Amino acid sequence: MIRRILSVLFLIWVIGFLWFVVALPRPAAEAGATDAVIVPTGGAGRIARGLEVLDTGLADKMLVSGVDPEVKPGEFAAQFAVEPEQMECCVTLGFAAVDTRSNASETAKWVAQNEVRSLRLVTTDWHMRRAAGELARTLPDHVTVIRDAVPSQPQFGTLFLEYHKLLASRAAGLADL
């Protein structure tokens, strides 16, 4: 009996992992403009995509969450070729977050302070589900979130680890931790 239960649980885990790998989120298709774009640091192409969203007028403001506290705004602007005027008006560097859960908390505070009603979440495809899930738990219901995944070529180990982080995040959400 226990062997059957464990076999079923293992099968569910395998099917879930295969779904996770095969059905990675994609870039937002023809989504309209939002009040803001949110970019958690940590993956290649995220900040560039966020700046592209700003430059094309799909968002008015951008929060880059989880920036290393030692990074100065001028250094950020130089590295990503952001004009000083755009840094001043439109780009906020968030230094409080250290992980996906604290990215969501930092984002929720920034959203409230800036009266954001719609946002575009830009993160790597393999990270999108967990980042969006954490964000959904912290944002008010009236805030619309568009998921805009940055395509990547993740290694097996990255996918394996992220799948388990997603499971842990969902379990924590069920337990309301």
What are the language-model segments listed below?
Residues 3-20:
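Hydrophobic membrane-insertion alpha-helices, especially the h-region
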Residues 158-177:
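A transmembrane-helix-recognition feature enriched in membrane-embedded lipid enzymes
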Residues 22-160:
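A structural signal for short, hydrophobic/glycine-enriched beta-strand patches
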